[in-house]
Regions:
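A short, small/polar-residue-rich loop/turn motif at beta-strand boundaries
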Residues: 100-116, 132-171, 240-243, 362-385, ...
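Extended, hydrophobic beta-loop-alpha segments that form or line the acyl/peptidyl-thioester binding
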Residues: 36-40, 118, 122, 204-207, ...
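A short N-terminal helical cap/helix-turn-helix that marks the beginning
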Residues: 2, 41-46, 58-59, 121-125, ...
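Gly/Ser/Thr-rich phosphate-binding loops and adjoining beta-strand/alpha-helix segments
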Residues: 6-11, 24-28, 87-109, 170-189, ...
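Non-catalytic, low-complexity flexible loops and terminal extensions
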Residues: 63-66, 159, 207-272, 321, ...
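Regions immediately C-terminal to embedded phosphopantetheine-bearing carrier domains
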Residues: 1-84, 105, 109, 221-225, ...
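His-Asp-centered acyl/peptidyl-transfer active-site segments
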Residues: 84-91, 108, 119-120, 233-243, ...
Length: 956
């Protein structure tokens, strides 16, 4: 797909020259191999490692409308049918050669099957009724034309050139095929209403498969599905809201410097001349590789080059450069939020939309010299193109499918020039079939067909790796020498831009358009530039979740020298074949897989909910040789004293402690802002599997979840929490005197319930219809009620943040959790069962509103505005799924947890865990509780749980 001889697992598809068209083909090939991707995945995870991680093995079930009956024309087809004039011979054609001798009957049979399979190949057009997809039975029977082998080369060329005469849209004859036995070549001519560049790639692949007797890939959605979606989009308020944007693109009229030449004839195909410019393969490869330096795509560079060429032309004509307006052709397969799968669909999907490139204050001469101005033009081009909504889909929808907006858009003058980048056609197709030329071949068209633009520029990559750029123009308006000169300017601009990118790019190469929408409004372009200087290896800028922002704020506010309560560390004892080098390599692999482990929190934007993912060189793992007498608690204490610098990455580290003949320890340390407890179990399985060489499955990248949370609406969540807490009089404060034995830091009390009590509580929960988590929570809240001295009781609870909707969540690493209040007014007339059921129902309803930050919820409660917390008691029920490593036998690594430490800023926190025997861990602030008082709290919880086993209808 890219022409690269070798591709590493971390190389970007786009850095290798991939584009949006070849991305569609990549998805198609992956699906045929059993890995199901979406096109957007290629843009989000452009390297093989990333795609392998997000791909799934099960194909989605596609429900598609029948490919038959009246069909509304796509926007581009509607322009053609309404304004182009003669339509019968409007076609695209390719010439292909099978790998081996083949009976033309096999080709004919295969083409008949494809016409039956794809509705676009059965289109019929009538002026009175418009487009219609004929049923396979009603469509004309396709017959392959056989070229007389006795014809001379010149005569055969004439026959092939005139093959388009066999097309008849009014009869539904949209496909003509000619088999040239002498050359073993198949010429396919298809009416443009039925085909486009992407469709050719689909068609030729399927033709080769059918001729080889293989099964075709399953179809996605069809033209009827697509046009149903576009029609609904034309009426959608959000899409109509794009009107002003599109009007702004063409509001400043742009004219080519043609000195007022008045054409003597119409601008038709018959009156057009053509010029070809070829950029050699060596320079083309540099051009294809250059955009990645600016996190750009090839179209960004091509439009920048065309803008430079037009700017130079205008400057030489004595005109101000200003802005240039170019119509850009795209493949048009932009399903947006529709979820439509068009990777195997044939049709004319092309989108056409205006792009305004501002060249004000650009030194054109410096740009052509490859100076800083070249970088500024490329940055502007990238920013313009990446800001276009849905890659231009809406322009055609509003111009042609909505009568009101269409009148307004068509009232403005259009761009005089159109650009289309076709990418490369795969020269070697399935089963050795080959294109005879680099792409589309010339077959006669209707000479009277009207052209939409003065200049058409079409770029394509040839079989030799060169870039061929075709320029079409009206002969009576533009001199051939002028076009040749501008074509040279375009080539010079391509070389200048690639030279600039490879040799002396700008220091700031990130733009706000490089960021996901959820983080883009949290940072300015100036601040982004500062981050780029501060973090030269910056790979991504991410939005922090509400809880992450809260943890950062609290860690920063700690007094100098204070222990950070969000510093988590634990120790594992390793067994098996412990190879330090392999452990280090496995650690590196999980840090590469889970980018949140390379998070840094820049001080310059710490109040704005922004984090930076740094390069893989920022992973912290060391192998330490210690004596056999080393004390584990000393190691963990030293690690906690070392702490973390939040501004630096990583906030996650590991130490392999070798202890002579004793089992090694693996000490894992992280700031809580990086991940939650669930994530730790994921990491351990990934580490052990990686050590054993076992492949890791799909996982949800943290930035995806953070982005999804950042884009959730806040107003509905605020309304919910305001209503939920409307009867709350204020924060729930624990009214306890400081114990005489109080000290500093945190202490803990642990208890393990007997197997019998655990079983009884599980039965109680099933009888009442509540989960074990709610059983323990209810007992804890009743104790907190006593400590607070009020029937209004509120505690904080930790929500997992993993809904199960996306199966990749289960293997994701990050801080998914959020801490939010649970409020209840304990009323004596309520039964225990009803009260606990009410708690469970409330928390179930909160699932859709868990993305609001705790401090935002706090402001909705009387007294919460003062800055004091809503509650002083926390509760978490840990029920992470068990994750046994797949590694077994020789070479495997085993790990056993021997120590763990984490803390909280809340004076009282109860943690419940386990299954067969439920465990409880009460963490307490020694400044508020003594050990005896904390032990008494634990005993009260146990006492209430013991009472629950026999209760149900009794009052609270």
């Amino acid at each position: 797909l890219t022409g690269a001889a070798r591709v590493s697992v971390t190389e970007s598809f786009f850095a290798l020259g991939g584009d949006s068209i070849s991305a569609i083909r990549l998805v198609s090939h992956a699906r045929r191999g059993g890995l199901y991707l979406e096109v957007r995945d290629v843009f989000r995870y452009p390297d093989p490692r990333g795609l392998a991680a997000v791909g799934v093995k099960v194909a989605a079930v596609v429900e598609r409308l029948p490919e038959v009956g009246p069909l509304r024309a796509t926007p581009v087809a509607q322009w053609f049918l309404e304004e182009a004039g003669p339509i019968d011979r409007f076609n695209q054609a390719v010439s292909v050669r099978p790998a081996a001798d083949i009976d033309p009957v096999v080709i004919e049979t295969a083409l008949r099957s494809l016409i039956k399979r794809h509705g676009a190949l059965r289109l019929r057009y009538a002026c009175s009724s418009g487009l219609e997809i004929l049923s396979p039975e009603a469509a004309p029977q396709f017959s392959l034309d056989l070229l007389d082998e006795g014809l001379g080369e010149a005569a055969a060329s004439v026959v092939l050139s005139s093959a388009s005469e066999g097309l008849s849209p009014s009869e539904g004859r949209m496909v003509v095929g000619v088999w040239n036995a002498a050359q073993r070549e198949l010429l396919l001519v298809i009416h443009h209403l039925s085909i486009d560049g992407v469709s050719w790639r689909v068609l030729l692949e399927e033709l080769a498969l059918l001729c080889a007797g293989e099964t075709l890939p399953s179809l996605g959605h069809g033209l009827q599905d697509w046009m149903g979606y576009l029609t609904s989009e034309a009426a959608r308020p959000e899409r109509i809201g794009e009107l002003e944007y599109w009007q702004d693109q063409t509001r400043a009229q742009y004219c080519l410097p043609l000195d007022g030449v008045v054409p003597e004839t119409e601008n038709t195909l018959g009156n057009a001349a053509h010029h070809s410019y070829v950029l050699d393969a060596q320079h083309t490869r540099l051009v294809l590789e250059a955009p990645s330096v600016y996190r750009a795509e090839i179209n960004d560079l091509l439009i920048a080059a065309l803008g430079m060429a037009l700017g130079r032309w205008s400057k030489e004509a004595g005109r101000d450069v200003g802005s240039v307006v170019i119509d850009l052709e795209g493949h048009g397969r932009e399903p947006g939020a529709s979820g439509l799968d068009l990777t195997q669909t044939i049709g004319w999907f092309t989108s056409l939309y205006p792009v305004r490139l501002d060249l004000d204050h650009i030194d054109i001469a410096d740009a052509f010299a490859g100076g800083d101005s070249a970088g500024h033009v490329l940055m502007r081009s990238k920013e313009v193109l990446h800001s276009i909504p849905d890659k231009g889909l809406g322009y055609g929808v509003l111009e042609r499918l909505n009568a009101e907006t269409g009148l307004q858009l068509r009232a403005q003058s259009g761009a005089p020039i159109v650009f289309n980048y076709l990418g490369s056609f795969e020269q070697v197709l399935e089963h050795g079939w080959q294109l005879c030329e680099s792409g589309l071949v010339g077959v006669e068209q209707d000479s009277g067909q009207r052209r939409q633009h003065l200049i058409d520029v079409n770029a394509i990559l040839t079989a030799s790796g060169a870039m061929q750029v075709g320029w079409s123009y009206p002969v009576d308006m533009i001199d051939a020498g002028v076009i040749a000169r501008v074509a040279e300017y375009f080539g010079d601009a391509l070389i200048a831009l690639s030279t600039h990118c490879h040799a002396r790019p700008l220091a700031q190469r990130w733009s706000l358009v490089d960021l996901e929408a959820g983080v883009r409004n949290r940072i300015t372009a100036l601040e982004l530039g500062e981050l780029e200087v501060l973090y030269p290896d910056m790979e991504r800028v991410v939005a922090l979740t509400p809880l992450q922002q809260g943890l950062v704020f609290e860690s920063i506010a700690l007094p100098v020298g204070a222990m950070d309560p969000y510093h988590v560390n634990l120790a594992l004892e390793l067994a098996g074949d412990v190879d330090p080098d392999r452990v280090t390599a496995s650690w590196r692999s999980i840090v590469q897989r889970h980018e949140i482990l390379r998070l840094g929190l820049p001080g310059s934007v710490q109040g704005q909910g922004v984090g930076v993912i740094r390069g893989l060189s920022h992973f912290d793992f060391r192998v330490i040789t210690a004596s056999e007498t080393v004390v584990l608690e000393d190691v963990l204490e030293a690690d906690r004293r070392e702490g973390f610098d939040l501004c630096s990455a990583p906030l996650f580290r590991g130490r392999l402690i070798l202890r002579g003949s004793l089992a090694p320890w693996l000490v894992i340390s992280n700031h809580h802002v990086v991940m939650d407890g669930w994530s730790l179990s994921v990491l351990m399985k990934d580490l052990l599997d990686s050590y054993a060489g076992i492949g890791l499955g799909a996982h949800l990248a943290w930035w995806e979840r953070a982005e999804e949370i950042a884009l959730r609406p806040l107003d509905t969540a605020q309304a919910y929490w305001r209503s939920y807490l409307s009867e709350c009089d204020g924060p729930c404060v624990l009214d306890l005197p400081v114990s005489g034995e109080a000290g500093s830091g945190f202490g803990e009390v642990k208890e393990v319930l007997s197997e019998a009590l655990t079983a009884d509580l599980l039965r109680f929960g099933r009888r009442v219809g509540i989960t074990p988590a709610i059983v323990v929570q209810g007992a804890y809240m009743l104790v907190v009620r006593q400590l607070a001295g009020s029937n209004q009781v509120m505690i904080g609870t930790t929500r997992s943040g993993r809904s199960g909707i996306d199966p990749r969540e289960d293997s994701g690493v990050g801080l998914y959790i959020n801490t939010l209040p649970v409020y209840s007014e304990v009323k004596d007339n309520l039964s225990v069962g009803d009260w606990l059921s009410g708690l469970q129902q409330d928390q179930a309803e909160q699932g859709s509103y868990e993305h609001l930050a705790l401090n935002d919820v706090q402001r909705l409660v009387p007294g919460g505005e003062s800055g004091s917390g809503l509650f002083e008691a926390m509760y978490v029920f840990e029920n992470y799924p068990e994750r046994a490593s797949s590694a077994q036998g020789a070479g495997a690594l085993q790990a056993r947890l021997i120590s763990a430490f984490d803390a909280t800023q809340y004076p009282l926190a109860l943690q419940a865990f386990g299954a067969g025997e439920l465990g409880l861990r009460l963490t307490y602030d020694r400044g508020r509780f003594g050990q005896e008082a904390a032990g008494h709290v634990m005993q009260q919880v146990l006492h209430i749980l013991d009472q629950f086993r026999d209760l149900g209808s009794e009052r609270v």
